[in-house]
């Protein structure tokens, strides 16, 4: 048996290849966006496969590495690229997008209640000087968000940073294509499991799995099925699986993780 590891982050592949070196050629690494999972796996000659695991979103390494610019905990270049080969950075978006587009990104990808205020504050600040660091952006967000919302468990900049990261890396579209591609390379009886970390991701996975496991799609008023639609998979998780208390003790960042799984028919 072989494992194919796909990631667009060269640092992640380097760490994984060193950790899994004892397994030799049983592990193959491909530097790519998992939206291209089908082409990547077929390129290794491994398709069809027995299982697919997608671990979505930013990694602890990326969050904890100041140079990558993913976190408001450090004052570092406003980068957020998972694939450092791409040109688009968070600084590019913050300094070039129109105020309305920034508001849309914060609202759509961050579900940020103060999206308009934050976008307006960014536009005002960059008119005087380009916004280049995570510290500068965090300062702007703290200025824009009313002070009474500063004391909660979630930092006021969390949703803005999430939204920019998703936009820079086109994460939701990658997820949609990765789900379709992953199901496309599974053999009958093959299983796919997906771990997500926020509601936007989980909603996409939930809907994709529901669609794949749905049979008849005729209107409810039809007395008999005429569509002939057959389910391609069956749900293995009726509800998302969340981390246990023991898991949270070992890994507090798993508190928002949700796992869903299906089996191809």
Indicate residue ranges for each PLM-predicted region:
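S-adenosyl-L-methionine-dependent methyltransferase catalytic core, i.e., the SAM/SAH-binding region
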Residues: 1-265
């Amino acid at each position: 048996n072989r494992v194919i590891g796909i990631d667009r982050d060269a640092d992640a592949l380097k760490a994984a290849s060193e950790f899994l070196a004892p397994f030799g050629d049983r592990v193959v690494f491909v530097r790519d966006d998992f939206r291209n999972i089908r082409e990547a796996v077929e390129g290794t000659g491994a398709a069809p496969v027995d299982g697919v695991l997608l671990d979505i979103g930013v990694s602890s390494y990326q969050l904890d590495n100041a140079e990558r610019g993913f976190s408001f905990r450090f004052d570092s270049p406003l980068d957020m690229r998972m694939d450092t080969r791409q040109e688009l950075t968070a600084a590019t978006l913050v300094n070039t997008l129109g105020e309305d587009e920034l508001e849309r990104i914060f609202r759509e990808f961050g579900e940020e209640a103060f999206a308009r205020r934050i976008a307006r504050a960014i536009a005002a600040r960059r008119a005087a000087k380009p916004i280049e660091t995570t510290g500068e952006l965090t300062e702007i967000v703290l200025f824009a968000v009313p002070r009474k919302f500063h004391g909660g468990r979630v930092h006021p900049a969390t949703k803005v940073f999430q939204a920019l990261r998703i936009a820079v890396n086109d994460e939701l579209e990658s997820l949609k294509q990765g789900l379709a591609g992953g199901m496309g390379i599974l053999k009958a009886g093959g299983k796919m499991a997906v771990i997500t970390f926020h509601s936007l991701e989980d909603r996409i996975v939930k809907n994709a799995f529901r669609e794949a496991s749905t049979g008849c799609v005729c209107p409810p008023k039809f007395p008999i099925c005429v569509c002939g639609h057959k389910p391609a998979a069956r749900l293995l998780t009726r509800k998302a699986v969340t981390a246990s208390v023991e898991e949270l003790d070992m890994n507090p960042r798993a508190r928002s993780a949700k796992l869903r799984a299906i089996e191809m028919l």
